Amino acid sequence: MRMRIKKGDLVEVISGKDKGKRGKVLRVLPKEDKVIVEGVNMVKRHQRPIPQLREGGIIEREAPIYACKVMVVCPACDKRTRVGYRFTEDGKKVRYCKKCGEIIDKD
């Protein structure tokens, strides 16, 4: 199944411990069917210091979350929505909001 989520999309978590949180997609992992969302599914990692590069300690970072647990938030109506595909007049394939019909891809 094709992933309808892209890097930079605003998404909302629909289930799990972070339900209701919104964040920007930092990375998409299509082979694993997961995404990394800013500020969601935070885990603590113990990091060893490397003298020239970084200091050690416990750092908090985002872990991947299954793509089926997030929904794209439409920038026009500000609601979470399913995403559809359609072609514009010039033949370009774009994603659109199935609730309000507005185009999500503005690039």
Curated annotation (Swiss-Prot):
InterPro entries: KOW, Rib_uL2_dom2, Ribosomal_uL24, Ribosomal_uL24_CS, Ribosomal_uL24_KOW, Translation_prot_SH3-like_sf
Keyword Iron: no
Disulfide pattern: none
Pfam family membership, one: KOW
Keyword Ribonucleoprotein: yes
Keywords: Ribonucleoprotein, Ribosomal protein, RNA-binding, rRNA-binding
Record GO cellular component, one term: ribosome
GO BP, one annotated term: translation
Top-level taxonomic group: Bacteria
SMART domains: KOW (SM00739)
GO molecular function terms noted in the UniProt entry: rRNA binding; structural constituent of ribosome
Subunit structure, as described in the record: Part of the 50S ribosomal subunit.
Family: Belongs to the universal ribosomal protein uL24 family.
Role summary: One of two assembly initiator proteins, it binds directly to the 5'-end of the 23S rRNA, where it nucleates assembly of the 50S subunit.
Protein's name in the database: Large ribosomal subunit protein uL24
Organism: Thermotoga neapolitana (strain ATCC 49049 / DSM 4359 / NBRC 107923 / NS-E)
Upper classification of the organism: Bacteria, Thermotogati, Thermotogota, Thermotogae, Thermotogales
Gene label: rplX
